[in-house]
Amino acid sequence: MEELLKYIVASLVEFPEEIVIREIEGEEQNIIELRVSPKDVGKVIGKNGRIAKSLRAILTAASVKAGKNFSLEIID
């Protein structure tokens, strides 16, 4: 799951080397924390949160296949 997210986000940001993805496992769902360069936060969130919503939708679709529940948090 982390590889998929990193691949997508790396194509959006100016500083892909600063992408940090951390997965926190919980009982009912796993939380994925995404950190990017402060200059790239706006690019990952997008206008009115459109890109962030799309990333969450992709993550939800992939989580069905994996049989787990994932939640995306973008940390600035």
Curated annotation (Swiss-Prot):
PANTHER family documented for this protein: RNA-BINDING PROTEIN KHPA (PTHR34654:SF1), UPF0109 PROTEIN SCO5592 (PTHR34654)
GO biological process, alphabetically ordered: cell wall organization; peptidoglycan biosynthetic process; regulation of cell shape
Protein name as annotated: RNA-binding protein KhpA
Function: A probable RNA chaperone. Forms a complex with KhpB which binds to cellular RNA and controls its expression. Plays a role in peptidoglycan (PG) homeostasis and cell length regulation.
PROSITE patterns per record: KH_TYPE_1 (PS50084)
InterPro entries: KH_dom-like_a/b (IPR015946), KH_sf_prok-type (IPR009019), KhpA (IPR020627)
Family statement: Belongs to the KhpA RNA-binding protein family.
GO MF: RNA binding
Signal peptide stretch: none
Cellular component terms per the entry's GO annotation: cytoplasm
Underlying gene: khpA
Organism: Leptospira interrogans serogroup Icterohaemorrhagiae serovar Lai (strain 56601)
Keyword Chaperone among UniProt keywords: yes
